[in-house]
Amino acid sequence: MALPGCGSRLVWGGMCLAVLAGVVYGLWGSRSDAGSAAAAQETTASVDMPVRTGDSGLQLPRFVTLKADRVNVRRGPSNEHQVSWVFTRKGLPVEIVAEFEHWRRIRDSEGAEGWVYHSLLSGRRGVLVAPWSGAKPLALLEEAAAEASAVALLNAGVMADVDTCTGAWCRISIAGHDGWVDQEKLWGVYPGEQVDR
């Protein structure tokens, strides 16, 4: 014969033990996680991230440029999908973030994404000069050094062709001018990326 209320006491007792075990584990786990987090950070810093490839066999994500003067950006990877917007700027750099058969999901400098047919994209590299900096012009330098002489001043959002990038500096060409720009001031190349044309 069961005692009255015994079942509910067992349930409450079990719940209290579970909560207590969770608190003890949380306190113990947080101390041990601090050391393992530091070790994980050291390991991550010394190991390169795995390279992801798309249907084309090329690395994802990667930067390319628009090959045509008019490029329809669709909501999905087929001609049946609605056109979300149209790019009208040949040479504009975009980032390929995914692939599906012959379609490429691209991202622009403002973060908008959509699908484009692969033949409308070029492997040629281009950049936008500091599109996030507003109206502040950026110096195109004679050499890859902060103290070098300016060849020209570039407005934010100006497009340029990439000649080469060292990982810290990029040599770009724009309207008959060639020079160097701090790589972190460009959209269309990754930080630390080396580019040879």
Give the ranges of each region predicted by the language model:
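N-terminal secretory signal peptides that target proteins for export/translocation
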Residues: 1-6
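Short, electropositive, low-hydrophobicity segments enriched in small/polar residues
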Residues: 80
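SH3-family beta-barrel domains
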Residues: 8-12, 20, 24-72, 86-90, ...
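Localized chelating/binding microdomains
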Residues: 16
